[in-house]
Amino acid sequence: MRPELIALVVAACQLGAAGTSPGLAQSAQWPAAPLTQVTGQPTPDPKDEPTTARGVHWDFSNHPRLVLSDETFIDFRLKLQWDYRTFSPLPDDPADDTEWSLRRVGVEGQVTRYVEFEASFEIDDPDEPWRAVYVNARPFAALQVQGGHFKVPFSRERLTGPTNLDFTQRAVGVRLIAPGYDTGLMVHGRVWNRRVRYAAGVFGGAADEIDSETDVPSLPGVRPLQTYDDQLWAWRVTLRPLDWKAVPAWLRRVEVGANAAYSHVDEGRYGWRGRAVFGQEFFPAVYVNGKRTRYGADAELEAGPVALRWEYLRGLDERLGQGVADDDLPELDVGSWFVAGAVVVTGERKADVERPRRPLLRGGFGAIEAVARVEHLTIGSRETLGEPASYSPRSVNLAGNRDTIWTVGVNWYPDRLFKVQVDAIRERFEDRARTLLGGQDTFWSYVVRVQFVL
């Protein structure tokens, strides 16, 4: 391990111990996050936050915070993730054995209780280094306006930050279908005693850009989504239907959500490509033209040390005039779902697992969490029209493919700053001709991730 990383770890452990000292236990907490970071947790109102100090000062109870007044402060953030991976069998195009999967710095905070902001920078992404750069005006809890560069309000898992995921890898369907960061304007809020949250926005369309991590396939007449002539519209609503006194307490936290997004892909561009867990292609690009529609639903239950999650997503790309005779073809259809569960075996509530009751080096071992997930992704033509399946990108019935993935893992939280994740991933493809290695349909991957968040 590099000397500078060792020094960082030692300093972080000292900071973690100091951060939980009784003298700092009453410091102010981070305010309500905007809906773009939905995690299923109730959002506290900044006016309810306790504040004991006055004047300009530093607060290190959670992370470095410069407090300018009771309601104005700046948080300085650092997020690091380092991965080690092994594969069996080894794919034709394997991912790197080791990688910094996340190196992000940023600031976030609020100016009075009515304005909050964030700016984060990805160190390892020279093409698009800026992640969230936005300002959120919140005159009322029921009506807030957010503008800048942030996540499109779509998909519970996509809106969950990378350091808060239960698994080392996002579900493949979420990565493929759900839009990510884009520049736009969004109206959002929470109503009905916070049982309902909503968001609706219009965006520039950069979230429809083809994945920049993989080279563009050289298909004749096909170009990537490099210009964004049409806007992307999206909305999301979440509801806690059982949040009533007559309902058992463990059921009140059930939350369901629904979302949709609408955009347009012009002729000469190509649609979604099926990608495996580590980005290898198992369904190539095809010709598309027309409307791009996304929709989905999800549900979550957190009760004590247990959490259960389900999400379904679907995406459709029209193929107008893309046949060999310039005729319209059936839509390109991508569908995915996953079911996931987590249980904290050391007894902490799931909502509090990142702050173990007995941290390492302070009389305990930290918190241990067991997790499991099954996910399913299919991609092909929406209709066959009685035609045989074909690998041609202009065929009526595109030869589809399916990826089924099982993941089991263990998460260790030694203290509030560190997390260690170990995942075993089994991936199976339906079409043996289009997998990660010719003739093989089943692959295993093993990942160890060390995470540090300040």
Indicate where each model-derived feature is located:
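Outer membrane beta-barrel
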Residues: 61-216, 225-266, 333-384
